[in-house]
């Protein structure tokens, strides 16, 4: 009603959400409260010790129950230090790592063919047309992870249905973020991990927000108008652009930290420091 610009968001989840919807639709993800029942827990591209402490009691309980905790991350973090094993692929190569694991799982007959036939489509095409492209030596060359470690990881994960993957947002910010998400999501589908309460989850906390985006955005008030769209990752450019007409004169920030989390933080900070910008 005020004529405000709309924000194209989010910097976190767009690629992964699109990838997930293309594979599994709007289905419930695995629940972190089931982690204590797992034999293998993979913390993939996430730093839960620092940024997801609400999940850590469940992971610590799983370890106390004998679970193996694996962290997959190019970085060294507090979570990789906490894990029993740190696997370090090169940034952006997670899809190759996941497909290499899948090839080992299939070659060793660890996949749940009955589950795949009953609950999925396209799995035979993936095996016939793609997995042979990812032998261990090639995956090692792509990811930098030794072939023996890839095989060990695949066998550890594939040897039980009681497995849980906690995937995070970081990989989705690569140009192949959707492909990486899809490849990783194939792992619990091939092992049938969902049958034990395991599987994969990305968000651990969204269910607590209870936000209805339709009520929040109130598109019914547009009355046929098409508002200007500003991409969240370009907020700094929008705030600094002196040719933008009309200029952005007010900024409402909710549940976000653009001064620290957008790609060009220097530009965002300069824009937010404008004397003529009203920021809430």
Feature locations, PLM:
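Beta1-alpha1 glycine-rich phosphate/pyrophosphate-binding loop at the start
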Residues: 212
């Amino acid at each position: 009603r005020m004529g405000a610009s709309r924000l194209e968001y989010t910097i976190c989840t767009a690629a992964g959400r699109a990838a997930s919807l293309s594979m599994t639709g709007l289905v419930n993800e695995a629940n972190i409260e089931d982690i204590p029942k797992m034999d293998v827990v993979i913390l993939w591209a996430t730093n839960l010790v620092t940024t997801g402490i609400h999940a850590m009691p469940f992971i610590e309980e799983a370890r106390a129950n004998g679970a193996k905790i694996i962290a997959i991350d190019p970085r060294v973090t507090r979570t990789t230090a906490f894990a029993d094993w740190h696997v370090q692929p090169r940034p952006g190569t997670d899809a190759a790592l996941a497909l290499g694991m899948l090839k080992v799982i299939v070659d060793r007959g660890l996949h749940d063919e009955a589950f795949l036939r009953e609950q999925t489509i396209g799995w035979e095409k993936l095996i016939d047309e793609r997995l042979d492209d990812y032998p261990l030596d090639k995956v090692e060359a792509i990811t930098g992870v030794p072939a023996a470690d890839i095989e060990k990881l695949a066998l550890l994960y594939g040897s039980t249905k009681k497995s849980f993957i906690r995937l995070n947002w970081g990989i989705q910010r690569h140009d192949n973020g959707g492909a990486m998400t899809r490849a990783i999501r194939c792992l619990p589908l091939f092992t049938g991990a969902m049958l034990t309460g395991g599987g994969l989850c990305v968000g651990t906390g969204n269910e607590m927000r209870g936000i209805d985006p339709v009520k929040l955005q109130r598109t019914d008030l547009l009355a046929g108008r098409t508002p200007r769209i500003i991409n969240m990752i370009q907020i700094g450019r929008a705030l600094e652009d002196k040719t933008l007409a009309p200029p952005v004169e007010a900024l409402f920030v909710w549940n976000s930290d653009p001064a620290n989390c957008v790609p060009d933080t220097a530009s965002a900070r300069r824009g937010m420091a404008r004397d003529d910008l009203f920021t809430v």
